[in-house]
Amino acid sequence: MSHALDAAALDQLFRTARTQNAFLDKPVPASLLQELYDLVKWGPTAANTTPARFVFVTSKEAKAKLAPALSEGNHDKTMAAPVTAIIGFDLDFHEKLPYLFPHTDAKAWFDGPQEGRHEAALRNGSLQGAYLILAARALGLDAGPMSGFDPAKVDEAFFAGTSIKSNFLVNLGYGDPAGLFPRLPRLSFDEAARIA
C-alpha cells in the first residue's frame, strides 16, 4: 500500500458509518450490485478459498420468500429495504480451488466430508460478508447487517439442492437518518486489545 486513506474516507467506512434500520425509497440498480461484488471479490481469504455466495433479494416475489424466515424485529425493515443480501457460504468451495489456487493441490486439503470444510467456509465467508459491508459504504450505500432469521428456512427458500448455507443478512440501500438509534459505545483499545 502506498498511502493511508484520508480522514473523510475513514469516516465514511468506519467512524461516522452507522448500522441502518430504515432506508429511503430509492432503488439500488443492479449495475451497482455488480460493482459491489466486483470490489468484494478482491478481499483476502485463506488460500483464496472465496467460499461466500451472495443472493441480492430485490423483487417482491423474492422478498415474499424471505419473509417467513425473518425474526419479528427484522421483518418490517427488511421488507422495506431496497436490497437484502443473503451472505451464504459454499461447503463445496474447494471444487473451485484448482482455478482459484492453482500453484498447489489445495483442493486436496479440503477433500472429505462437508463437515470438515464447515469451519473454513464459515470463517472465510464471514470475512467476505464484512468486505461487502465496507465495499457498500465505499460505494455510497448504507448497510444493516442482521442475524435474526431462521437459516434453515432461508436455505430451503434460496439454496435448496445446493451445498450453500446461509450465514447472515445485510440490508442495503440509502439510509434514512430518522431510523437511526443513538450511537452506541465501543470498547477502548485497552479493553479489547493488547500488544504482546
From Swiss-Prot:
GO molecular function, one term: oxidoreductase activity
CDD domains according to UniProt: RutE-like (cd02148)
SUPFAM superfamilies linked: FMN-dependent nitroreductase-like
EC number(s) per entry: 1.-.-.-
Superkingdom to which the source organism belongs: Bacteria
Signal sequence, start to end: none
Cofactor(s) of this protein: FMN
UniProt record similarity statement: Belongs to the nitroreductase family. HadB/RutE subfamily.
Entries under HAMAP family matching the protein: Oxidoreductase_RutE_HadB (MF_01204)
Protein name: Putative NADH dehydrogenase/NAD(P)H nitroreductase Smlt0482
Organism: Stenotrophomonas maltophilia (strain K279a)
